[in-house]
Amino acid sequence: MTSAASVSAVSAQQTAPRADRPVWPDEGPRTWTPRATEPAITPNDLRTRLYQIADDSMQGRNIGSPGDFEATAYIADVFRRLGLQPAGENGTYFQDLPYGAFALQGPAPRLTVGKKTLAAGARWIPLAPDAASGSGASSNLRNVPVVFAGHFGDTSVVLDPARFRGKVAVFIGGPRVPGAQGSGAAAPSCASLPNRFGADAAIADDARIRASQKASGVRPLARRDERARAAGAAGVLFVEPIDAFAAAAVLHPRGTMPVRDSLIAGPPAAVIDSVTAHQLFGKPAGELSVGDAGVAVTATWRYSFSVSATPARNVIAILRGSDPTRASEYVLISAHNDHVGVRSEAVDHDSLRAVNMVTRPQGANDPVCRPTPEQQHEIDSLIAHARSIRPPRRDSIMNGADDDGSGTVLLLEAAEKFASEHPARSMIFVSHTGEEAGLLGSKWFTDHPTIALDSVA
């Protein structure tokens, strides 16, 4: 029997928000069942590959993570099924990178200025081994005098070995370039947006991440200055601001490529704040001249390096050319397989998309900014529309379907297409890791090529 109550129930079921209903015009299905691919490059093939590469199970494919390890295994399996030859190490498709984490080990780091001992944190932080600063992995300085060395990067000033040998050189500034982090690194005005449907949370979280990167020294450019090392300095101190983000980062391992042995064995380096610098010399650093001497310091700490449990690795395969006279010439196709992993906080998919559509149409190329009233109204309308269709979907996984899942699937599709066409020249397909961490995989391949680079056309 049909009743008004049953009709109302059916109507409610039909109009209630559903997570599987699309909101955006270009939104694809939430899931995609893998299907057999074909030599031609087709939308179905691209979806089949992309839905696997960017799946939540890959956990954002951060370099050295289990997710990226799984993604590289998938890529190698595709190469294997296509009949491509392994071109990695030891007869495999893989080229491992010595990627891992530097972490402080042993007793807590200590810096003694005169007779005052400071724990690492708000006033100073020891630096992990680094190519830009030339810093070593450990410090065991005992009552070593300090000498002011001027501004880091000012190579017009020559450091006299007679003054600096066996001493601790103190620079204003350090290897990180001020301002290089980008115009959208800190957007405090975004945090004051009204809390509407989570739109402000999406913006504030993005601003917080960028500000955290700025504070902890994660910046895309760095200066090199090896004058202190060349002058025989026993250690290096950089006078720079220190805040809570930078201090907290010292207590946790940070993933990085290990530096050369000669640099790991180089002089230890640390950042000190302006107050500590004043204690060293008895006056502000801005009033010092190169060669001014300060009090002696004692500094002890030790970093150790460990490779990731799931190795960071490139995936490399060769399609051998069909023409014997040209098979020794290679055409190289590459894309990076990694992304940025998992955020510390979850944001709502639809809120974030609404904010980015309105305020950042060019994606990361647009700075984080406060929406105009008109933009805020548009954002609110978009999110209200989304809420009428489905509930919020909070997520912390940065899936990387576009960056660079799209490039990865095109690499695989190109490999399948060319494998069916038997080109005259050989082709080498390189799936790099570590692009997001600073082009690490591509640099490692060019520094340690598995074929002669001059054979690449």
Whereabouts are the PLM-identified features?
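Structural recognition of the beta-strand scaffold that forms the well-ordered cores
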Residues: 51-54, 96, 146-148, 168-172, ...
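Acidic, glycine-rich active-site loops and adjacent beta-strand->loop/helix elements
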Residues: 175, 242-243, 337-339, 431-437
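N-terminal capping segment at the start of a domain
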Residues: 22-35, 40-66, 82, 86
